[in-house]
A protein has these predicted regions:
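Short loop/turn motifs that connect adjacent beta-strands in outer-membrane beta-barrel proteins
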Residues: 25-31, 80-81, 129-139, 156, ...
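Residues on the lipid-exposed face of transmembrane beta-strands in outer-membrane beta-barrel proteins
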Residues: 36-40, 72-76, 119-127, 144-148, ...
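Structural signature of outer-membrane beta-barrel domains
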Residues: 41-45, 87, 91-95, 147-153, ...
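Predominantly the C-terminal beta-signal and adjacent terminal strand-loop region
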Residues: 201-305
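Gram-negative (and chloroplast) outer-membrane scaffold detector with strong preference
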Residues: 80-166
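Surface-exposed strand-loop-strand hairpins of Gram-negative outer-membrane beta-barrel proteins
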Residues: 41-69, 73
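Extracellular loop and loop/strand-boundary signature of outer-membrane beta-barrel proteins
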Residues: 55-60, 104-112, 176-182, 266-269
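Residues that define the transmembrane beta-barrel architecture of outer-membrane proteins
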Residues: 30, 64-68, 115-119, 138, ...
Length: 305
């Protein structure tokens, strides 16, 4: 759902740099910022709290399972109004079928938690600048980019948190399901977001932003495709691990065979998971430096002095 805006954003950015490469360079003042951001995270995927089948967008957010998010951010202007930014953010995401009224999801009764440790780089476009003769002390901005993140879904078993990837709760790694491979706990994300920043009179910048992270994995919550036949665990695992895998693969109470059948649907394999960092308050320090950068007529001319 974000593919078209992302492609447009990247095309405009690439075109801008191509034009700049053809023009004469001159010294201008640019800005850089470094600081921290604090907000909340929320998971968007097969597990969630809305009354619909899980969907990767804001209307599937469950406020009950949002968790704090903390990170650092570095932003540097490449050309006026266009900056590169680097983010490193850590948080925990959660999901619980018990919180939804959707019949299938509530009966499925799965739950999870997973750490998210992300690093990413983005191109950011701002309406106004904090430097130059036309500088302002406020600006809205948008950004898009690419990053990578680590995740490790866990569920509770006998009062302890258990790593789910090693168990193969959908039959991953079992010879009976050669098409179900163990998933990696490292994946790619595509941040898309925006916000608003204000420059104070002592060079500190206070901002507020919200962003979605589309990903290349459907296993942040360890739920994607189909239930396995639990008997296969006992053919290949030791008894303790087989019992645990069977129990965490299907946590329903077995009273509704019309909803959950052996080797039937467990998740939605057609949509990858996503997560958001929302309500992010950024607190950065503003600095200026001079470098030779090409100019574009009209758009940058008055900012170069």
């Amino acid at each position: 759902m974000f593919k078209k805006p992302l492609i447009t954003f990247l095309a405009i950015t690439i075109g801008m740099f191509w034009q700049i490469s053809l023009l004469k360079a001159q010294p201008i003042v640019l800005s850089r910022e470094f600081g921290v951001n604090l907000g909340f995270s929320s998971f968007l995927g097969d597990l969630g709290g809305s009354d619909d089948i899980g969907r990767a967008f804001f209307w599937d957010i469950d406020p009950e399972v949002t968790r704090p998010a903390l990170g650092i951010v570095y932003r540097q202007e490449i050309i006026p109004r266009t900056a590169f930014r680097f983010n490193a953010i850590a948080s925990m995401v959660k999901g619980d079928d018990a919180l939804t009224d959707n019949e299938f999801r509530h009966y499925r009764n799965l739950s999870f938690r997973s750490p998210i440790v992300e690093v990413s780089g983005e191109i950011e476009l701002s309406m106004n600048r904090f430097t130059g003769i036309k500088k302002k002390r406020w600006t809205p901005y948008i950004y898009a980019g690419i990053g990578g993140f680590y995740f490790n879904p866990q569920a509770q078993y006998d009062g302890e948190w258990v790593n789910l990837q090693e168990l193969g709760t959908e039959g991953q790694g079992l010879p009976e399901y050669p098409d179900r491979k163990k998933y990696s706990k490292i994946a790619v994300c595509f941040p898309i977001g925006g916000g608003f920043r204000v420059l104070t009179y002592n060079n500190w910048v206070l901002g507020f932003e919200m962003a979605a992270r589309l990903t290349t994995t459907d296993y942040i919550d360890d739920v994607s495709s189909y239930y396995p036949n639990p008997d296969y665990y006992f053919l290949h695992y030791d008894l303790e691990k087989a019992v645990m895998a069977a129990a965490l693969s299907n946590t329903s109470d077995g009273t509704r065979p019309d909803l959950i059948v052996p080797e039937g649907g467990r998740g939605d394999p057609t949509n990858n998971d996503a997560y958001i960092f929302g309500g992010m308050i950024t607190f950065t320090y503003h600095m200026e430096f001079q470098r030779n950068v090409s100019s574009i007529k009209c758009y940058f001319s008055d900012d170069n002095k």
